[in-house]
Amino acid sequence: MVSKHLKLQSGDIACEISGSDTGRLVIGIPGLSANLRSFDVIFDALDGQRHRKLAFDPRGRGRSSETGPGTYGWPSHASDVIALADQLGAPTFDLIGWSMGAWIAMVVAQSVPQRVRRVVLLDAAGLPEESIKVPVYAGLDRLATVFPSRDAFMALVRNLSHYQPWAPWERLFDYELIEVDSGVSFRTQRPAPWEDEQYRLTQDPYKLWAALTMPVLLVRAAQQVPPNFGFLITKDDYARFLREVPVARGIEIEANHYTIGMSVDASRAIAVFLDE
C-alpha cells in the first residue's frame, strides 16, 4: 500500500493506493464526512492481482485540502474523481460510492460514461427519508466537539450499533482524530460536509439514474439507522431503481447504513460483481 498526496487543480488529495499497478482501477468514494479508511474492508475483499485500489479523502476531509466556500457539491467531487483517474493513467475505471459517494459516482457516470466500467452504489440512490437528517446532522455537529482524549472518544462510540464491527471503525476514527488544545477533535471540519449537504437538498438524484448505462450493483442496508431513523434507500426506491435501470442488479444486506460498508457479506458481493 502506498500513501501519497496527488496534486489536482482543486488542491491536494490524500490517497492510498494498493493492489496491482496493472490491475483495473477501482475508486472508493466516501460519504459526507468520511475518509479513505471507509474502504478498508471492501478493498480487503478485492483481489489485489486483478485490481488497483484507490481510496481517498474528498476535498475538505481528512488530510486533503480545504478548497473554501462555494467549491463543494457533487460535480466538484466528481471532477476530482476523474482527475485522480487521469493522474493514475486509467482510461477506464470502476466506482464504489458509499452514501454521498453514491450520488457522486452517478455524476461521474453522467460526465464520462465511456470511462466508467462498473458502478457500485452503497446504500444511496434516490432521496433518503427525512428522519435520516437527525443522526447525520448530529454527526456533523460532532466534528466541532473536543473530547478529553482519544481513549475517551473511543470509549463513547465503540459499543454503538452504528459502528460495528468495531475494528474497522476504530481505524477510521484513529485516522481522523487529531490533538488539539484540551484534548482531541476531528481533522474534518463542518463547513465542507455541511455545504455538500446543502447542495444535496437542492438536487433530484432520480434524474441521475438515466446516466447509468454500465453494469450497476445497488447494495441496500435492510436495517434502519439506529435506533429508528429510517433508511437512505426505502424499499420502494430499491424496487423502483431495479425497474428503471435495466443494467442494475441489487442485493439487500442485514446491516444499517453505517455498518454496511464494513459488512463481510456486502464486501463479498461487491468483489464478485467487480471481478466480472
PLM regions with names:
Residues 1-26, 48-51, 90, 239-240, ...:
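Alpha/beta-hydrolase fold catalytic core
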Residues 14-66:
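Conserved HGGG/HGGXW glycine-rich cap/lid loop of the alpha/beta-hydrolase fold
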Residues 97, 101, 105:
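Gly/Ala-rich beta-loop-alpha elbow adjacent to hydrolase catalytic centers
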Residues 106-110, 117-148:
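Flexible "cap/lid" loop of the alpha/beta hydrolase fold
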Residues 148-200:
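Conserved alpha/beta-hydrolase catalytic His-Asp/Glu region
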Residues 180-244:
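Conserved serine/cysteine hydrolase catalytic core
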Residues 251, 255-264:
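Catalytic histidine-centered segment of alpha/beta-hydrolase-like enzymes
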